[in-house]
Structure formats: C-alpha cells, structure tokens
C-alpha cells in the first residue's frame, strides 16, 4: 500500500525540507525511518563496466559494515548493483524512483523492487500510476542527493545522468566522491572530470565512512546460501565464458521457467550477470 506525506505534515522528511525549496508530497512504501539513519548515495552509469559493477558492489557491502543506508535510483547498471549487494549483505537500502512506487521500472528489477519495499524504502514524488519519463529522472536525482549524507559517483560517461546528481549534491552543500577510472575509457570520462573539478577521489572506501564519523558495526555480513539446483547452475556458468540460457537449460535438463527463475535469483545474489540472453559469472 502506498503512503503519502504532504508538504505541511510534521513528519515530512527533514532532509528534503532542508535541501530543497520546491519540495512536494512524498509517496512511499516501506520503512520511512530509514531517512533518519546515516546514508550514502551510490549512483552511476546504466551501461556499467565490470569494473564499475565490482566497485559498486564492494562499496555497498562496505556501507553495510558501517551501518549506513544505501541510497540509489533502481536503474540498471550501477544502481542495481548497489541495491543488490546491499540486500544480499543484510543491509538497508532506499530506492528513489522516477515513477510511482506502484510501477515496476525497469521490469527487470521487479523482484528487487518488491524486496526493497519489504525490507527498505521506496520513495517518489510521483503518485501511483505515474510512468517514468525522460524528464522525471533528473528531477528525482535531487531527492537522491538530498536524503544522502554523501554522494558517490561510481562510473559515469560524459553525459551520464548521475552527473546531474553530483551537481544537485554540490548545490545542496553535500560532499561528492568520485571513483577514478581508466583515462582512456569513455565510461569514466564523467567521474574523472568530477575529480578534476574538485570531487573527492575515492580510493579507500573506509575513509568515506570515517569522514562521516561512522565506525564498523559488529554486524555479520550475510553468507550467500544456494539451493542444490542453484549451485548446479552456478557451476555450469563458471565452466563457460558466456552461455545462453538455452545452453544452460540443456546441460542441467530442467524446464525453461525454472531456469529463468534460478538465473534471476543468482543475478539478485550478485553471482552472475545476464545480458541479452547471455549469462556470465560476476566479477566480485
């Protein structure tokens, strides 16, 4: 069920009120109290490289170790990796949506969105039924930065939408961190430019959380448990450089619906990547 907090409500998120002059009603599903906890935004390109995905996952896991909430936008690429790694390590995450919280977008993240609703927080300025439009993404980025104590741009090309998040954060007086990338890679032009222009180069994740005054908690990071069939599928994927779902199904000898479900589960657990029908092992 979707809840709404009007602008004049005394429970309206203080972080948003302090950062934005044009704040609007907030629609949400999940645990609104997560907004009161220390948090970092982890954002970046939809077309992320294996390096970017690995960095996003490692940073999200580190956030869990320090008891910080992970904030992102539920988009493909860096956002998905951050949410997924946080969930798999038993952390708490907030997804700020460019559509209504009842709308599944992107469709590939439907299972993840449901899980965030159950264990974290879905947040949006848009009422139920609103579909994502080109203009709603940059608008929601100012919410991502507003509710976060620090913003990390993991990987971004020269025209990545995550650069808008960085700009919003700077306008709000938030610290922006950027992970350095290969200077010859188009996918790192944006992050490297941010560093050139004054963003903090993030080369040690612990330093970020120490900057926020956080200490590592005693929380044990969740172990990843697999069913017998999940383990079999993972071993098959490990044995080949890049396999189609049909090839895996043929080797394991199970029906298509079951293999698709297992592929989704393993991808949610951050163990594999599935793109364009091809499955490969994750770079952790």
PLM feature segments, named:
Residues 2-284:
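Glycine-biased, small-residue-rich flexible motifs in mid-sequence functional cores and linkers
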């Amino acid at each position: 069920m979707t809840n709404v907090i009007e602008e004049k409500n005394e429970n309206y998120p203080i972080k948003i009120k302090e950062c934005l002059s044009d704040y609007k009603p907030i629609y949400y599903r999940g645990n609104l109290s997560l907004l009161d906890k220390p948090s970092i935004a982890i954002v970046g390109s939809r077309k992320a490289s294996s390096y970017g995905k690995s960095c996003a996952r490692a940073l999200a896991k580190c956030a869990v170790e320090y008891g910080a909430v992970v904030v992102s936008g539920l988009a493909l690429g860096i956002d998905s990796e951050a949410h997924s790694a946080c969930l798999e390590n038993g952390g708490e995450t907030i997804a700020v949506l460019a559509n209504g919280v009842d709308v599944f977008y992107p469709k590939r993240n439907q299972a993840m969105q449901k899980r965030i609703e159950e264990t974290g927080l879905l947040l949006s300025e848009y009422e139920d039924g609103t579909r994502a439009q080109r203009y709603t993404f940059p608008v929601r980025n100012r919410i991502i930065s507003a509710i976060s104590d620090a913003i990390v741009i993991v990987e971004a090309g020269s025209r990545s939408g995550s650069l808008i998040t960085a700009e919003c954060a700077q306008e709000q007086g938030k610290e922006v961190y950027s992970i350095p990338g290969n200077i010859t890679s188009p996918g790192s032009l944006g992050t490297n430019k941010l560093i050139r222009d004054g963003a903090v180069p993030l080369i040690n994740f612990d330093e970020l959380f120490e900057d926020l005054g956080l200490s590592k908690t005693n929380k044990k990071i969740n172990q990843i448990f697999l069913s017998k069939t999940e383990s079999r599928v993972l071993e098959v994927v490990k044995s080949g450089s890049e396999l189609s779902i049909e090839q895996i199904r043929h080797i394991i000898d199970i029906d298509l619906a079951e293999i698709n479900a297992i592929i989704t589960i393993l991808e949610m657990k951050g163990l594999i990547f599935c793109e364009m029908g091809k499955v490969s092992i994750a770079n952790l």
